[in-house]
């Protein structure tokens, strides 16, 4: 087996391999860090490379922390009975991974999100690493594999649900019977696809 296969096998079941103990130690540190942190190199090299990461200029890895659970909406100032406050039992209709990608994109507005992957979770938080690309960097523009991201119609792609996590959340992994209301978009079908 090659190196990447060993890494992949270890991450498949973290609690049974050496990864579990490593994650315990890392998360003690990660909990004290800010929500969005730029890091030097990917934690899961096999996953990052499979999703398009290259160790060259123009690529940035960002670790993002997202709180688990449904969305708690802002509290009303006006009076009403607690059951009509409309605070709980609302889901954001997005995966936590998609939310993590958006957080990273807001922190680094000059970069575009390429993809992301899971790196850990505890009882309260999930952590994702987001692969980001600088579309204005000459190294990126001259690489035919990734030069497409510099085109203007890929600007702000994460906010339009064009990343892998975004497309999954919009139901675009499915086609045929049962997927009639997801194309051309959720909005075009008046939200019936959600």
UniProtKB/Swiss-Prot annotation:
PROSITE patterns registered for this protein in UniProt: RIBOSOMAL_L15E
Keyword vocabulary terms for this entry: Ribonucleoprotein, Ribosomal protein
Listed Basic and acidic residues bias regions: 177-194
Region of interest (Disordered), ranges: 165-194
Biological process per Gene Ontology, one example term: cytoplasmic translation
Any Pfam family matching the protein: Ribosomal_L15e
Gene3D superfamilies (alphabetical): Ribosomal protein l15e
Domain of life from the UniProt record: Archaea
Cellular component, GO annotation: cytosolic large ribosomal subunit
UniProt KW Ribosomal protein keyword: yes
Molecular function terms from GO: RNA binding; structural constituent of ribosome
Keyword Transmembrane helix among record annotations: no
Biased amino acid composition, Basic residues: 167-176
Family to which this protein belongs: Belongs to the eukaryotic ribosomal protein eL15 family.
Family matches, as NCBIfam families: PRK04243.1
Binding partners and assembly: Part of the 50S ribosomal subunit.
Protein name as annotated: Large ribosomal subunit protein eL15
Lineage of origin: Archaea, Methanobacteriati, Methanobacteriota, Thermococci, Thermococcales
Gene behind the chain: rpl15e
């Amino acid at each position: 087996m090659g190196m990447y296969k060993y890494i992949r096998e270890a991450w498949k079941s973290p609690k049974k391999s050496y990864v579990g103990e490593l994650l315990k130690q890392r998360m003690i540190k990660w909990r004290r860090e800010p929500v969005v942190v730029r890091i030097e190199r990917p934690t899961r090299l096999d996953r990052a490379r499979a999703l398009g990461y290259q160790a060259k200029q123009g690529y940035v890895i960002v670790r993002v922390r997202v709180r688990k659970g449904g969305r708690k909406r802002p509290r009303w100032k006006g009076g009403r009975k607690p059951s009509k406050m409309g605070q709980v039992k609302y889901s954001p209709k997005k995966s936590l991974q998609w939310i993590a990608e958006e957080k990273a994109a807001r922190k680094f507005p000059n970069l575009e999100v390429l993809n992301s992957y899971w790196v850990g979770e505890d009882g309260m938080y999930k952590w994702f690493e987001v692969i980001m690309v600088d579309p204005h960097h000459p190294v990126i523009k001259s690489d035919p594999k990734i030069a497409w991201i510099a085109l203007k119609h890929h600007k702000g792609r994460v906010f339009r649900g064009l990343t892998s996590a975004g497309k999954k959340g919009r139901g675009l992994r499915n086609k045929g019977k049962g997927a009639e209301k997801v194309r051309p978009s959720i909005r075009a079908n008046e939200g019936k696809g959600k």
